[in-house]
Amino acid sequence: MEKTSMFSIHEGKPIRCKAAVSRKPGEALVIEEIHVDPPQAYEVRIKIICTSLCHTDVSFSKIDSGPLARFPRILGHEAVGVIESIGEHVNGFQQGDVVLPVFHPHCEECRDCKSSKSNWCARFADDFLSNTRRYGMTSRFKDSFGEDIYHFLFVSSFSEYTVVDIAHLVKISPDIPVDKAALLSCGVSTGIGAAWKVANVEKGSTVAVFGLGAVGLAVGEGARLRGAGKIIGVDLNPEKFELGKKFGFTDFINSTLCGENKISEVIKEMTGGGVDYSFECVGLPSLLTEAFSSTRTGSGKTVVLGIDKHLTPVSLGSFDLLRGRHVCGSLFGGLKPKLDIPILVDHYLKKELNLDSFITHELKFEEINKAFDLLVQGKSLRCILWMNK
């Protein structure tokens, strides 16, 4: 049997399937039957095998005003699937390929995509509000009443089937377990890449990571892979400290136990003047200031991964900048999805990269609201939701 034959019955036609739909802000997702249209030019339709969720999904499910408050919507942006059907002008992909949908675009054609200096995509990355990458607000999802459902970050993986533009698609080796591969769609890649590509952490260097969620722990894993000599984790939750050891963390600071001392002062004392690299993974301006102050004068580098939901301006000392400290942002860890995710997959297959420890729970897709609760309560790092288990 050809590997495409299992998909041919639905090719070119709408598919009925289950999806978890976010109907109203702050309310539980609703499992319902939807229709997923066939892919158009430069798109593929994917059968999702498994998906996970991160705090971005939780945050967007609660937004109740402004342009980001769109309902009904299918959330989800970390997943692995198999290509079910292909639209016109799709090159490099075929039915049956195992693929990773990624929120960050990589068109491979614009100036930035061709440059080694950036992972920005000048062609597509400025638009994160449309439903489909090349067709604006046109939706590929309809509910049982024929009403459109909004997409999310060009992925929408909380559905048995979804339609994704090839600029957001990475073909991966079928040898990697799909639950581990799903982690590379967003948070874990973001953290590893920040240490690997953005900071370019050197062997024997010192690192401080502020916030030990999945992204922060992944920064530690990336720093470990690069051979960092000391990796300091900063968090309010002491339970994260034991977990952090699995990802290479050597030292921990509970910020509530610092007394009158600033976190940056404690770090400077521990390292003899400050760390070579610091990473802010929470999104608090005050924490960014501390991360910046914790680095060495003359060469210290601070990488910003957290997003302040209020977009508050940050004030940094001009004299500190003048004396050689650096600060930079990091979107998706500086990774070019189509080039760098396969490299991370290869590291995992060679048993060099720890992905297994990020998965703390596995549930059926129908239990998705339980997964949300676990994440909000701080009991889950990454929960894998299986579509057909």
Swiss-Prot record:
InterPro entries documented for this protein: ADH-like_C, ADH-like_N, ADH_Zn_CS, GroES-like_sf, NAD(P)-bd_dom_sf
Cell location: Cytoplasm
Reactions mediated catalytically: a primary alcohol + NAD(+) = an aldehyde + NADH + H(+); a secondary alcohol + NAD(+) = a ketone + NADH + H(+)
GO CC terms of this entry: cytoplasm
EC id: 1.1.1.1
Pfam families per the UniProt record, alphabetical: ADH_N, ADH_zinc_N
Binding site for an alcohol: 56, 77
Entry GO MF terms: alcohol dehydrogenase (NAD+) activity; zinc ion binding
Residues reported in the UniProt entry to bind NAD(+): 56, 211-216, 235, 240, 305-307, 332, 382
Entry annotated with the keyword Metal-binding: yes
Cofactor field: Zn(2+)
Residues reported to bind Zn(2+) 2: 107, 110, 113, 121
Keywords tagged on the record: Cytoplasm, Metal-binding, NAD, Oxidoreductase, Zinc
Cofactor detail note: Binds 2 Zn(2+) ions per subunit.
Gene3D superfamilies: Medium-chain alcohol dehydrogenases, catalytic domain (3.90.180.10), NAD(P)-binding Rossmann-like Domain (3.40.50.720)
PROSITE patterns (alphabetical): ADH_ZINC
Subunit annotation: Homodimer.
Family classification: Belongs to the zinc-containing alcohol dehydrogenase family. Class-III subfamily.
This protein's name: Alcohol dehydrogenase-like 5
